Amino acid sequence: MLKPLSADKWNYAMAAHLLNRAGFGGPPAEIQKLADLDHDQAVASLLDYEKIPDPTANPDWARPDPTRIERFRAAKDASPEEKRKLQQDEQRLQRQRMLELRGWWLQRMATGPRPLQEKLVLFWHGHFATSADKVRDAYYMWRQNELFRRLATVNWQMLLLEAGKD
């Protein structure tokens, strides 16, 4: 087992290292804020992220789209040319939303108030190996990442069960 870091070794460089390991690094002011705490407080501030308010707004489209079902129903009775056009429009919309989702998530990772939570979301996202190419719907990708955010630190069985339902 690792020995706890002695108080005299806790400094700015160690705080930067901790922030790199538990998150995605941070600006000098954030590193200094951690360095000003003692080691245990710094670790606790990253681990107890549920206590930190998260003001990040969700993307505008991050909710069920009631018009999507209607668009698919309309396509059922459409001519082959109209179906192709509707399909292209839907694919274009989903590609745009997927780009927005990626930007939104990268922003959360880079500047969000809960770096460990986002690092865990990225870990679980990679572990369960879902991709935009398979899902093709930004809302469902966002929803899965929200599941990982909510359950990032719960027990494995619960996460596995919920991810299986998702």
Q: Each predicted region: which residue ranges?
A:
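Active-site-surrounding "flap" and adjacent substrate/cofactor-binding loops of secreted or lumenal enzymes
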Residues: Y12-A13, G26-Q96
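Extreme N-terminus nucleophile/cap motif
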Residues: A16
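N-terminal cofactor/phosphate-binding cores enriched in small/glycine residues
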Residues: L19
